[in-house]
A protein has these predicted regions:
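Glycosyltransferase catalytic domains, chiefly GT-A lineage
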Residues: 1-248
Length: 248
């Protein structure tokens, strides 16, 4: 069975349950797949009615920060054990799914795929990280995996890297010192693949950078303003970084 797995943990600054209220209906509409949300009890109590959802209540690991704010991203390595599906589309909760493109990507013989390139939909070409580490970064925003021994080893390796992240930052000269799943998965794939290449999602991850402030969300697209310029995207999946989208 193919299904979608999401993580949703509120913080004192951001209400991810409000973002889920916008993205989950889009997933249901455009993918028509069963959905599992991994969350904690405090966030679960805030969740709006979303129809049939399989909830996994966990005590999420804490201690990571970004921009001096809590960043609850330390449990993604548990996706293999927490997913009830034979094949899983693992997504960030702020992935706005406006197409059925992910269904096509899931029609693969590969047991693990992740984006290694990103497309800045604002047109500002914001993502240039080639000099930020010695290992090419991947984007853990969207991962498609099957339950195999190989994929289990990948997620186990991510856990191992998380527990020793400072060491791996030194080893791979990673500038971003707060734990980041993008680098953890990149290192895991690099090492478990015998330092060779690995299969990736053959498209760029459409992303709206955090500098773009979302002004409107509809059933078909997102609008924003950035540096005095207005932009929008229609009928295309997009990963929205601006957490202010919770209030739009």
């Amino acid at each position: 069975m193919l299904g979608v797995l999401l993580y949703c943990f509120n913080t004192e600054y951001y209400r991810y349950d409000k973002i889920a209220a916008k993205t989950v209906p889009l997933l249901k509409k455009n993918l028509g797949l069963p959905i599992t949300i991994v969350t904690n009890f405090d966030t679960f109590k805030c969740m709006p009615p979303l129809g049939f959802i399989n909830y996994k209540i966990v005590d999420n690991e804490k201690g990571n920060n970004i921009d001096n704010k809590p960043w609850h991203n330390l449990d993604r390595h548990r996706a293999y054990e927490l997913s009830p599906y034979d094949q899983t589309i693992l997504l960030d909760i702020d992935y706005f799914c406006y197409t059925d493109h992910l269904l096509t990507l899931a029609e693969t013989d590969q047991d693990f795929m992740v984006h290694d390139k990103v497309h800045d939909v604002s047109g500002n070409d914001s993502y240039k990280f080639a000099r930020s580490s010695m290992v090419p970064m991947v984007w853990a925003t969207c991962i498609i995996f099957k339950k195999t021994e190989r994929t289990k080893a990948i997620f186990d390796m991510v856990r191992y890297i998380k527990e020793r992240y400072n060491y791996f930052c030194e080893l791979y000269r990673i500038n971003f010192r707060n734990f980041r799943n993008d680098y953890a998965f990149a290192i895991a794939l690099h090492q478990l693949g015998g330092f060779k290449g690995y299969e990736t999602i053959p498209t760029r991850l459409p992303t709206l950078p955090g500098g773009a402030k979302v002004t409107k969300v509809t059933d078909t697209g997102v609008s924003w303003v950035w540096q005095g310029r207005v932009g929008s995207i229609e009928n295309c999946d997009v990963h929205v970084i601006d957490k202010g989208v919770q209030n739009v």
